[in-house]
Every structure is written in structure tokens, then in C-alpha cells.
A protein has these predicted regions:
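Bacterial N-terminal signal peptides that target proteins for export
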Residues: 2-20
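Sec-dependent N-terminal signal peptides
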Residues: 20-26
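Structural detector for internal amphipathic alpha-helices that build alpha-solenoid repeat scaffolds
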Residues: 37-58, 74-88, 97, 105-119, ...
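Core helices of alpha-solenoid repeat scaffolds
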Residues: 60-61, 92, 123, 152, ...
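Residue-level detector of alpha-helical secondary structure
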Residues: 63-66, 78, 82, 94-97, ...
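Alpha-solenoid HEAT/Armadillo-like helical repeat scaffolds in large eukaryotic proteins
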Residues: 63-71, 94-102, 125-133, 157-163, ...
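Cyclophilin-like peptidyl-prolyl cis-trans isomerases
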Residues: 427-429, 445-684
Length: 684
């Protein structure tokens, strides 16, 4: 398994950003905590001020220009990146000029920052930068994709076989940029499906498969037998009925069925998902996959059974018995419920039902299954009793299952009941879920109840319920402000300014919370803290010593290398939590076949965290197989949860902080299933 996985994309391709960093490290060899990197002295206090600026999301134009004019190479590169991180649109002209900077690290970060800004005024400059060294062209191509439609002509021109860059990595980035266009320029992508580079073929296939571009499906048929498993996986995805439609269904079904028997489990997973979109014609392959030797393939098949099986109970019982694993059976339970088949494990009145087991995960699974029920009546029958469960994680699952229906006309009779229990729950996330589910039809007469819930949430260590309540107030004000009682308006305006910026940001769009906007934003931390990050995290990494960490699981050990220059605050946060034992004796609470393995929640249901949030540190690292990212519930909501990529997913680039990569333990990553135990994480 390890040898086979070593041939995956992460090993076939060295990330241009990673290569750029490697060469930059070589050029800057000799760093020490004295603040000198090679012959270029790093001004530690000034670098610390830059970190503080980015952390506070403030644009300090004077500081940026000072660093760009007289700073060391690492400082200048970081300053260019920070402009994009703080959404410094006023400095877009500065970034465009930096595309010609003689330091390729600066120019490359400038290109990436223009992408974060989606700078339409920079299209010509970015297109010109495609002729720059690969380090720069790599991010210029990505940035053009972020700009989107205004960059279409530039992307199509750059992909013409007679003018395309020679570097296969830059070609790859150009192709990946096109999947963000609607429609995808298939004519420009098509020639690269036959390229000699597996990376280029994969990128071209991804550009068609990710957005389900129907115009390119026929062109992918020859690639169903490609030598690269990564390419075949994208072909399997593209053969979904969503892309192929009825007109090409007969043409792709045979190769798709063959891909469901592919030696690579990642390919089989995508093939099974696509076959399920055809309904009954895909039944045999999907059902057969429930007995696949790979656990993740079995789980993926179980998740799709609702698309291929009807409500014949015997077929569902057969599927249930195919595997005894928790995640497999949970998936069968949910799929069966979508066909209004209530398996014994979900029978609320049965004493042996999962709803009555001591393991909270089993009870939560029943609540989750209720959310898939085709009728409100069935949903209430299954999930509502579990909304009174003694465990907040089960109650949270129950309210989450009911949440999509709480704002509909059909659910109106029990909306008030939902508010009565959910808004008073002692658990912060139950309250957050309940409030969030009601936001769409927020009314003035409901604000007092939510205001009472907000006051309860002021004592929470987590901000979720406070933020949800503020969003409810804003929604109600926009929909129904004329019916707000004067006393309610006065009470809302008298609320203390929240300490957490997430709640303040949520209120930014209405005059009701004008005082919050005027309130000063304190520096997140003292300057000495940021300077210490520079000395202890950034300078050693610039000198070539990247921090490492090990995730010791029940299936083996995963070894990580952390990007302390690209995401210093995130890396420091992760290593600090690990040193405190925060990640000891927990489980992977979310594992999605062929996507991610996620951990970092001691609560265990995906809703927990360390009682604080950290800012995003978006950077040019890409989401390849083995990349490590910070999990979010929205911008700047990171904390302790992280995820490991089981396959490359470029659509995540620029949306979540990449702060590390795997350098060992590939077979462990492939074997993980949801619920697997983590003994400990330790950094070095």
C-alpha cells in the first residue's frame, strides 16, 4: 500500500509553492534567532508588527511601504502576502508593480495576493507574469482563476498549444484556473487531455470533472484507462449523470462500471458515487461495493444506497448485515431513512434501538438519520425525542436534523416549540443551531426570546451562539424593523460591545449596532508575543529547520512537516495545543472517503474547539494529497480542528489555511475511518 500510494499525485508533483520555499530556504541558509537570514537581517520587531497587522485585519500602509522599501527578503515577501490577507484593495496597484520584483518570492506572493483580492484590474499584469519564472507564473495562473470571468480571455490565450508555458506545473495551474469559469472553456482544455505529463492530464480532467462540464465528458472516455490513478479518479467523477446526462449515459456506463472495479480504491469510490446517480442501472455495482475489501469504499457505497434501492426492507437488511463497522452502518441507517425505511436500529420505541444505547454516537446517528426522512412527520418521530437527550452532542444532532425544516411553512406549528427548547438549552451549540435555523424567517416578535438566549450566551466560552443570535437580530431588523418595540430596540442598542470580532462582524451591516462599529478594535495580543513567534517559529524555518509533528493513531503514525513561515500563528497554535495534550485520546470525528480526515475536537461531534478562534493565514500552499488545513465554520473561525487531505482538491485553495503536509504514514491515512482513535500528537 505504501509503495502504491507513493506514486500518487503528491509524489508525482512537487508543489511549485513548496519548491519555491525550498529554494528560498537554500538562498537564506544560515538563519538564527539573532534575526539574520544569510546576509539579510530580519527586523524582528517590524516583522512582529506585520504579523499583528495581519492578525487584526488592519491595513497599515506606512508599515507595508516601509518593509517593501527597506525590509529583508522574508519581510518583503510576507508584506506582499499580507496585503491580500487583510483585503488591502487600496494596495492592489502596489501588488501589480511587485509582479516585476527581482525577488521571485516577493513577486510570487504578490501574484497570490492579487488572487485573494480577485483584482480585475490586474488581469493584464497577471497575464504578463505568466512569462515570469515558474515560481511567479504558478501563482499568477491561480490568481487569474480567482478573478474569474474577466480573466477568461487571458486564460484561453495562455492555454493555446503554441503559446502555453513550457513548465508543466504552470500549465497545470492554468488548467485548474478554468474550472472556476462558467462555462468551462472546454475547447481550450481539450488538447491537454493527451499531454505526456500525468499532472497536466489530471488538471485538464479536473477542470472538466469538478464543475461537471458536459461538453467535455466524451473527451474523457479514452482516459478511463489512463496509467494515472489520479486521472482515472477524475474521469470517474465526470461520468456522473449530472455531467453525462441521458445522451451520453449509454456511452459512459461501461467504462464507469469498469472503474468501479479499478485497483485503486480512490477511483472505485468516485465511480460508485457516479454510478449511483443513474439510479436503478447502477444498483448492482453499488450494492456489490458494500462488500469491497476497502472500508472506505464500503462506506461510500453505503452513503449512496438511497439512490439505488427502493423501500424493500429485505434489501436494506441485507445491506445492513454486509458490514458491522459503525460508520458503515450509520451510513446505511441514513440512506434507508431517505427511502422512509426505518431499520431496527432507528426504531425509537424498540429497546434494542441505537436510540437507547449508552454510546452517545449511536444515539446521535439515529438523530442524524431522522434528518434524511422524506416527511416532517417521520422527522419528528425520529429526531424530536432525541432533542431531550441528556448528552448535548445528541441534542445538537437532533436540532441539526430538524434545522432545515424549522423555517418552512410546513413546520410553523412547532417553530415556537423549537425556539422554546433550543434557545434555552445549556449547550452553546444546541442554542447556536436552533437560532441559526430560524434566521431565514426571523420576525420582530421573536427577538425577545433570542435576546434572552444571547444573554445566556454571554457566559459561553465559545462564540457560536452569540454570533448566531446577532445574525438573527440583523435578519429580523432587515425584514421587520418597523415592528420592533421601542424597548427591544433600546435593549439591543444597550448590549455591551462583544470582545470577539466574529460577533461584531456579524452586526456590521445594520445601523442597529452602530456603536459596535465605532468601538476601537484592540490589538489581538501584545507586540512581544508576535516577536516571539518570529524568533521561535519563523526564523528557524527560514534557516531550514521546519517543525514536525507526529499523529499517533490506532492504525499507525502519521508524520507531518509544518509551514512555520507561511502560517506561523496557525503552526504555533497547533504545536501549543499538542504540547498541552489537547489532541490526546480523541477520535477522528469526520472522515470522508477520498476527501478528508478531520480531528481536533475533544467534544467529539465536530462542534467543539479551544474556546477561542484564530485568523485565517491564507497562503500559496496548495491542497494536495497529504496537505494539512485548518477547519473552519466560516472565515477566521479556526481553533483546534484540522484536516488531512486524502486526495488533491484545488477548489479549497485560497479558502482554508494550509499549514503543513504529510511526509510519512500514507497507508495510515488511507486506512482511517470515522471514529478511529488518536493516542496523541507531539511536535518537535
Amino acid at each position: 500500500m505504501r509503495a502504491a500510494r507513493a506514486r500518487r499525485l503528491v509524489s508525482l508533483v512537487t508543489s511549485p509553492a513548496r519548491l519555491a520555499a525550498t529554494l528560498a530556504l537554500a538562498a537564506c541558509a544560515g538563519a538564527s534567532t539573532s534575526g539574520r537570514v544569510g546576509n539579510a537581517p530580519v527586523n524582528v520587531p517590524r516583522y512582529g508588527r506585520l504579523l499583528a497587522m495581519a492578525d487584526a485585519r488592519r491595513v497599515d500602509t506606512a508599515l507595508i511601504h516601509e518593509i517593501l522599501r527597506a525590509g529583508s527578503r522574508p519581510e518583503r515577501a510576507a508584506a506582499a502576502l499580507a496585503i491580500g490577507q487583510v483585503h488591502g484593495t487600496s494596495l492592489a496597484p502596489t501588488l501589480r508593480a511587485l509582479l516585476d520584483d527581482p525577488d521571485t518570492a516577493v513577486a510570487s506572493n504578490a501574484a497570490y495576493a492579487l488572487g485573494l483580492l480577485a483584482d480585475t484590474g490586474g488581469v493584464a499584469a497577471l497575464a504578463h507574469a505568466l512569462a515570469a519564472p515558474p515560481f511567479v507564473a504558478h501563482n499568477a495562473a491561480w490568481a487569474l482563476g480567482q478573478v474569474g470571468e474577466p480573466a477568461r480571455a487571458a486564460l484561453v490565450t495562455a492555454l493555446a498549444p503554441t503559446t502555453a508555458p513550457h513548465d508543466s506545473r504552470v500549465r497545470s495551474d492554468l488548467l485548474l484556473a478554468t474550472f472556476r469559469l462558467e462555462p468551462v472553456p472546454v475547447e481550450a482544455v481539450r488538447p491537454w487531455l493527451a499531454d505526456s505529463s500525468a499532472l497536466v492530464r489530471w488538471s485538464a480532467a479536473y477542470a472538466i470533472a469538478r464543475p461537471y462540464a458536459a461538453a467535455g465528458v466524451r473527451d474523457l472516455i479514452p482516459l478511463a484507462t489512463d496509467t494515472s490513478g489520479e486521472v482515472r479518479a477524475q474521469v470517474a467523477r465526470a461520468f456522473s449523470h449530472r455531467a453525462a446526462g441521458d445522451s451520453l449515459a449509454a456511452l459512459v456506463r461501461a467504462p464507469l462500471t469498469a472503474l468501479a472495479r479499478d485497483p485503486d480504491p480512490h477511483v472505485r469510490i468516485n465511480a460508485i458515487r457516479s454510478l449511483a446517480t443513474y439510479g436503478a442501472p447502477g444498483k448492482a455495482a453499488v450494492v456489490a461495493a458494500t462488500r469491497d475489501p476497502d472500508a472506505n469504499v464500503r462506506i461510500a457505497a453505503a452513503e449512496e444506497l438511497g439512490s439505488v434501492l427502493d423501500n424493500t426492507r429485505a434489501a436494506w437488511m441485507s445491506a445492513w448485515k454486509a458490514d458491522t463497522g459503525f460508520m458503515y452502518r450509520r451510513s446505511v441507517l441514513v440512506s434507508a431513512m431517505s427511502q422512509d425505511v426505518v431499520l431496527p436500529a432507528a426504531e425509537i420505541d424498540e429497546p434494542d434501538s441505537w436510540a437507547h444505547q449508552s454510546d452517545w454516537r449511536l444515539r446521535a446517528a439515529v438523530a442524524d438519520a431522522g434528518g434524511a426522512a422524506p416527511t416532517i412527520l417521520r422527522l419528528r418521530e425520529i429526531s424530536l425525542p432525541l432533542a431531550r437527550d441528556p448528552d448535548p452532542r445528541v441534542r445538537s444532532a437532533a436540532f441539526a436534523a430538524m434545522a432545515p425544516h424549522a423555517d418552512t411553512a410546513e413546520s410553523h406549528p412547532w417553530r415556537r416549540e423549537f425556539m422554546e427548547y433550543g434557545l434555552k438549552d445549556p449547550d452553546f451549540f444546541v442554542r447556536a443551531t436552533a437560532i441559526g435555523s430560524l434566521e431565514g424567517h426571523a420576525a420582530a416578535d421573536e427577538v425577545p426570546l433570542v435576546l434572552a438566549s444571547y444573554r445566556l450566551a454571554e457566559a459561553d466560552t465559545n462564540s457560536d451562539a452569540r454570533v448566531a443570535a446577532v445574525r438573527f437580530f440583523v435578519s429580523a431588523w432587515k425584514r421587520d424593523s418597523v415592528h420592533f418595540a421601542d424597548s427591544v430596540v433600546a435593549a439591543l442598542r444597550a448590549l455591551p460591545v462583544p470582545h470577539d470580532m466574529l460577533a461584531r462582524d456579524a452586526a456590521d451591516s445594520v445601523s442597529l449596532f452602530e456603536s459596535w462599529r465605532r468601538a476601537p478594535v484592540p490589538d489581538p495580543r501584545p507586540s512581544a508575543w508576535y516577536e516571539n513567534i518570529v524568533r521561535t517559529r519563523i526564523l528557524p524555518a527560514l534557516g531550514g529547520t521546519l517543525p514536525r509533528a507526529e499523529i499517533v493513531t490506532e492504525r499507525g503514525t502519521i508524520t507531518l512537516e509544518l509551514y512555520a513561515v507561511d502560517a506561523p500563528l496557525t503552526v504555533d497554535n497547533f504545536l501549543t495545543l499538542a504540547a498541552k495534550g489537547y489532541y490526546d485520546d480523541v477520535r477522528f470525528h469526520r472522515v470522508v472517503p477520498d476527501f478528508v480526515a478531520q480531528d481536533g475536537d475533544r467534544r467529539g461531534d465536530g462542534n467543539g474547539g479551544p474556546a477561542y478562534t484564530i485568523r485565517d493565514e491564507l497562503n500559496p500552499r496548495r491542497y494536495e494529497r497529504g496537505s494539512m488545513g485548518m477547519a473552519l465554520s466560516g472565515p477566521d473561525t479556526g481553533g483546534s480542528q484540522y484536516f488531512l487531505m486524502r486526495a488533491p482538491y484545488p477548489h479549497l485553495d485560497g479558502r482554508y489555511t494550509v499549514f503543513g503536509r504529510m511526509i510519512g504514514g500514507w497507508s495510515v491515512l488511507d486506512a482511517l475511518v470515522q471514529g478511529d482513535h488518536i493516542e496523541r500528537i507531539r511536535g518537535s
